[in-house]
Amino acid sequence: MSKKLYIKTYGCQMNVYDSIKMQDLLYPFGYEPTENIEEADVIILNTCHIREKAAEKTYSELGRIKKLQDTRTKQGLSSAIIVVAGCVAQAEGEEIFTRTPYVDIVVGPQSYYNLPELISKVVRHEKHLIDLDFVEEAKFDQLPEQLYPQGTSAFISVQEGCDKFCTFCVVPYTRGAEFSRNVEQVYREALKVVSSGAKEIMLLGQNVNAYHGKGPADKIFSLADLLKHLAQIPNLERLRYTTSHPIDMNNDLIKLYGTEPKLMPFLHLPVQSGSNKILKAMNRKHDREYYFDIINRLREARPDIVLSSDFIVGFPGETDEDFEDTLDLVRRVKYGQCYSFKYSPRPGTPGATRTDQIPEHIKSERLTILQQELMAQQLAFNTSCVGSTMKVLFDRNGKFDDQIIGKTPYMQSVYIQNPNKSLLGKIIDVKITKASLNSLTGEIL
């Protein structure tokens, strides 16, 4: 009888990819995935630590799992093995056992390949096992190739860690220094997902455009080199990557938007603030003028490119003038979509120790103003698409039986009413008939 594995994933696309790999890793040991936590023999929370609220969600979920465990015990059933994985695990370590002593395993992002052994030890009644080692390439060398198809759009992790040490960010402490997978590993995985039906690949990394993987004859490939190499794969229609740092947007990568049709005209390029003073305090290693130059060069290479970004409001020391600089940058760039957050002090980062923290009510006010501007831009861009014909990759069923959903080259969701589910996995010309803030509606031509 097979055992059941339940994984709940928080945070970024990298965590989604890691969860897929953990699922593939445990399958040969008899663990089949389930979406029903109540029947699980192993429960894994793959956690995010980028903001305080995200970390507290982990502990709230662990509290709910404890109640589930107590119910199973009363019913005479065995308890599930509880695993906390991901960046909360890496950041908090033994503290997790202190706060939630019923957790069995704490494992960091670089040690997932040890999960079968750790789970086996718990089965043999060992408790409070922890593995937070940084082993860099060993993670990619020892995780299995894909077992379960990812679908029409697939994630492939090519780079991990970050050397930038932005003063608000925990990633260098939870994911370690930058390292890149070798080209052959990435290419083999890309061939595998395409042969399983993927038409689109999203390359992942904490700082993916810093990619510098070893290729044939020990040549070091940049991200632009890797994208050109992957673009040669037959039946692969679309390439994307995330997340990028402006300082690593080199000329070869920018020019590729004008020469490689498989590279989609959408780029998530976080800037975080429009104030030079705050950018310096954040240790972003560039100023707003540098960012504007990157944007201008991208638009010269690919005039229809659509941009996305991340913004943090209320970083320590941010004045009204600094915030106005952020609004000015937003209005000058004109984004298609964005993510924005209030600054959240993360333990162990330089920003958390500053004495000029911004009051919560001011952060909330600024976030509301910024989000109103960003939503207006997003709606304006979506509305500008009405009446146009766009190539849509249909990748999933909708909420209703006669509805399917796809993605434009610009990462917009498109809904159509069509009972022909054979369109899934295909790129089809769609006339856009309606726009809302978060999606488009269209008709098959």
Swiss-Prot record:
Binds 2 [4Fe-4S] clusters. One cluster is coordinated with 3 cysteines and an exchangeable S-adenosyl-L-methionine. Catalyzes the methylthiolation of N6-(dimethylallyl)adenosine (i(6)A), leading to the formation of 2-methylthio-N6-(dimethylallyl)adenosine (ms(2)i(6)A) at position 37 in tRNAs that read codons beginning with uridine. PROSITE patterns: MTTASE_N, MTTASE_RADICAL, RADICAL_SAM, TRAM. Residues 148-380 form the Radical SAM core domain. This is tRNA-2-methylthio-N(6)-dimethylallyladenosine synthase. Residues 3-124 form the MTTase N-terminal domain. [4Fe-4S] cluster 1 binds at C12, C48, C87. It catalyses: N(6)-dimethylallyladenosine(37) in tRNA + (sulfur carrier)-SH + AH2 + 2 S-adenosyl-L-methionine = 2-methylsulfanyl-N(6)-dimethylallyladenosine(37) in tRNA + (sulfur carrier)-H + 5'-deoxyadenosine + L-methionine + A + S-adenosyl-L-homocysteine + 2 H(+). The gene is miaB. The keyword Aminoacyl-tRNA synthetase does not apply.
